[in-house]
Amino acid sequence: MNLIESARAGLITPEMEQVAVQEGVTPEFVRQGVADGTIVILRNARRQNVTPVGVGKGLRTKVSASVGLYGETGGIDVEVAKIKAAVEAGTDAIMDLSVSGDIEAMLAETLAVSPKPVGTLPLYQAMAEAGRKYGSSVNMRDEDLFDVIERHAAAGVDFLALHCGTTMNIVERARNEGRIDPLVSYGGSHLIGWMLANRRENPLYEHFDRVLAIARKYDVTISFADGMRPGCLADSLDGPQVEELVVLGELVRRAREAGVQVMVKGPGHVPLQQLKATVVLEKSLCHGAPYFVFGPLVTDIAIGYDHINAAIGGALSAWAGAEFLCYVTAAEHVGIPDIDQVREGVIAARIAAHAADLANGLTCAREWDRELSRARKELDWKRQIALAIDPERAGRLREERSDAAAAGCAMCGKYCAMEIVSRYLGTARHTC
């Protein structure tokens, strides 16, 4: 039996037990969530080096970092270094979104190096291979696409991002919608180009039962990619985006009936006042499926600072119910992120996730903050740095100050509020 079947049969699997320990919840809570479809467990049994990660209602908000080969930039060694940096920074998952070069070799390295669940977007490789084989990606055959999907699942990929809900009807709506930025999804735009060139329905939608058969065979989670995500605030929650969400809701139901774990991807650029509505809409139309959001970016003008932009949107979206944040780096809209920007993007997304977990009342999040606050009150710098979301940077900043051995912070020095108040209240920690 696969994970959903086990959960529905009342059986608690080792993966459910592992997730329960990580999350500080009961195995029964995890089992019920998997059975209901409000929790997915990212793991492929063919990978021995991966720790299962739970995503969904009642669990910690998770973060994903994206890497991959793009054009002439970097190489496999560079992307592997980014994976290691993202893992060290605390990402919960890695997405290998390679679009060129030796995609097969890159994926093999990603699966070997990452101890975290790995996701891919098989369409990228299928399009690249079709371009080499037939001279153009628009000549890709259905069989080529499904072959790559199965190869990724068989290789051990833990979750597959697939544009199953981008239908020809939605493409026609988008054509007439008057969007400022008609299409910003890389995979979605290539798929739609194929559909229009061939005058064919999306094969991932037309042959969705075949998608389900592969996912069920390998017990792989499907992540419904969004071809119609808004690329600017003005396009948020327009007809094509909402119609695609309606279709995805129907496919969520079919996936669950087939015993396949599924989550939904969204949304891109969303103004603050629409964040809650966007999440509520997904939860309603997609039957409570876990929501995996890119950003969201709450302004269009933050070039060079989009990791901060995304952290704002991510925190509010996760507070509203989104459970999985796709990181955004400072290089977004400009170029390919370097290792430092990858690390910075993960930390920014983790801060957003943690802020939402606090707002949502998760005990583990609250205790983490309280522990650091106690250490701060006691001027216990070693403990503060260890508890910081980025201990390496916190420690470096502490060491860079001229009086690093002093008890108080550099801002207040001998007038440290913690030290003075503790002295008068008789709560000073004399061992500091």
UniProtKB/Swiss-Prot annotation:
Highest taxon in the source lineage: Bacteria
Cofactor: [4Fe-4S] cluster
Gene coding for it: bzaA
Role played: Together with BzaB, probably catalyzes the conversion of aminoimidazole ribotide (AIR) to 5-hydroxybenzimidazole (5-HBI) in a radical S-adenosyl-L-methionine (SAM)-dependent reaction. Is thus involved in the anaerobic biosynthesis of the benzimidazole lower axial ligand of the cobamide produced by M.thermoacetica. Requires BzaB for catalytic activity, as BzaA alone displays no activity.
EC number: 4.1.99.23
GO biological process, one term: thiamine biosynthetic process
Assigned keywords, A-Z: 4Fe-4S, Cobalamin biosynthesis, Iron, Iron-sulfur, Lyase, Metal-binding, S-adenosyl-L-methionine, Zinc
Note on how the cofactor is bound: Binds 1 [4Fe-4S] cluster per subunit. The cluster is coordinated with 3 cysteines and an exchangeable S-adenosyl-L-methionine.
Cellular compartments per GO CC: cytosol
Binding residue positions for substrate: M95, Y124, H163, S185, Y186, G187, D226, G227, M228, R229, F292
GO MF terms held by the record: 4 iron, 4 sulfur cluster binding; lyase activity; metal ion binding
Residues that coordinate or bind Zn(2+): H269, H333
Annotated residues for binding of [4Fe-4S] cluster: C409, C412, C416
Species of origin: Moorella thermoacetica (strain ATCC 39073 / JCM 9320)
Keyword field contains Nucleotidyltransferase: no
Name of this protein: 5-hydroxybenzimidazole synthase BzaA
Keyword set includes Iron-sulfur: yes
Short name of one Pfam family: ThiC_Rad_SAM
Catalytic activity: 5-amino-1-(5-phospho-beta-D-ribosyl)imidazole + AH2 + S-adenosyl-L-methionine = 5-hydroxybenzimidazole + 5'-deoxyadenosine + formate + L-methionine + A + NH4(+) + phosphate + 2 H(+)
NCBIfam families: PRK13352.1, thiC
Family of this protein: Belongs to the ThiC family. 5-hydroxybenzimidazole synthase subfamily.
